[in-house]
Design a protein with these regions (language model features):
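Conserved SAM/SAH-binding loop
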Residues: 263
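Flexible "cap/lid" subdomain of the alpha/beta-hydrolase fold that forms the substrate-access gate
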Residues: 1-19, 23, 31, 51, ...
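Conserved ATPase "switch" residues in P-loop NTPase domains
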Residues: 44-45, 250
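Active-site machinery of serine-nucleophile hydrolases
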Residues: 45-54
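The serine-hydrolase catalytic nucleophile loop
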Residues: 30-41
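Recognition helices and adjacent regulatory flanks at domain boundaries
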Residues: 36, 55-58
């Protein structure tokens, strides 16, 4: 279903559960969409109101051509904030994964009183949570030379925006990949990334990701000052956001439950039932 924002953006989202119940906002990551939560949502919806929007540039959210929308994490967070305003959601627990993490933490900086709890599933807010995967992207963040930037964008495109790399994000780090291989996930993601102009959107966001790293100290300050309860449930074999990022929450979060599972980046695909159970136990005791 869609919500039309005041600026004309059509946000596609999935929703389940009664709006009279506490809300859980599910924020997906690269290269996915709210489709990644298709199996988790029913596990949560009996007790909670669950909302999962597609971020701008992903899934089926539509940006009007005449809006001249700049694809940045600041604008993604602003868009999701507007989506929440339209739905009159002013209190919510937030599940952050991959790109959903800087989106969720930016929302928290804007409205710290809105967040009732955080579930971080490989959703990073610490330098030590960035693996060597990010080294070429650090070069992209650092350069201001247009020629060098063009070369780096092409290199990143060839390494990351491919079908093989997309499939690898789902199956990498999984001890038994054949048992959790769901081709619809990576085929859908790659098809959506293959739309005209979408590769440039993804490269713009890779370039902009450095602005999130600059904000990591602010995200950490928020965690310390708000003392929001955090469930960090991570795939310990993630080569993009390694478990050191989960361990780092210990520095700033007093009310922390940390669980490392034998899986990779897309842990919600391989450990859906376990994540659902952990979330329900955690949220039932916190909100």
């Amino acid at each position: 279903m869609y919500t039309i924002l005041p600026n004309g953006i059509r946000v596609f989202y999935r929703e389940a559960g009664s709006p009279s119940k506490p809300t859980i906002l599910l924020l997906h990551g690269f290269p996915a969409s709210s489709f990644q939560f298709r199996n988790l949502i029913p596990l949560l919806a009996e007790k909670y109101h669950v909302v999962a929007p597609d971020l701008p540039g992903f899934g089926f959210t539509e940006i009007p051509d005449n809006l001249n929308f700049k694809y940045s994490f600041a604008n993604i967070a602003t868009t999701i904030g507007s989506f929440l305003d339209v739905h009159k959601i002013d209190k919510f627990a937030v599940y952050v994964f991959d790109y959903g993490a800087p989106t969720g933490f930016r929302l928290a900086l804007e409205c710290p009183q809105a967040i009732t709890a955080i579930i971080s599933q490989n959703g990073n807010a610490y330098e030590e949570g960035l693996s060597s995967f990010w080294d070429p992207l650090r070069q992209l963040w650092a350069t201001s030379d247009p020629v060098k930037e063009k070369e780096l964008r092409q290199a990143v495109k060839g390494a990351v925006l491919t079908f093989e790399a997309t499939k690898g994000q789902y199956l990498g780090g999984e001890p038994e990949p054949n048992k959790i291989d769901e081709p619809a996930t990576y085929h859908l993601d790659y098809a959506l990334m293959s739309r005209p102009g979408n590769a440039e959107i993804q490269l713009d966001l890779f370039k902009d990701y450095g602005t999130n790293v600059v904000l990591y100290p602010k995200f950490q300050e928020y965690l310390r000052e708000s003392q929001v309860p955090v469930l960090a449930v991570w795939g310990k074999n993630d080569i993009i956001f390694p478990p050191a990022g989960a361990e780092a929450f210990k520095r700033d979060v007093k009310d922390l439950k940390l669980v490392l599972l034998d899986g990779g980046h897309f842990l919600v695909e391989s450990h859906t039932q376990e994540i659902g159970r952990l979330m329900l136990e955690f949220l039932d005791s916190k909100i």
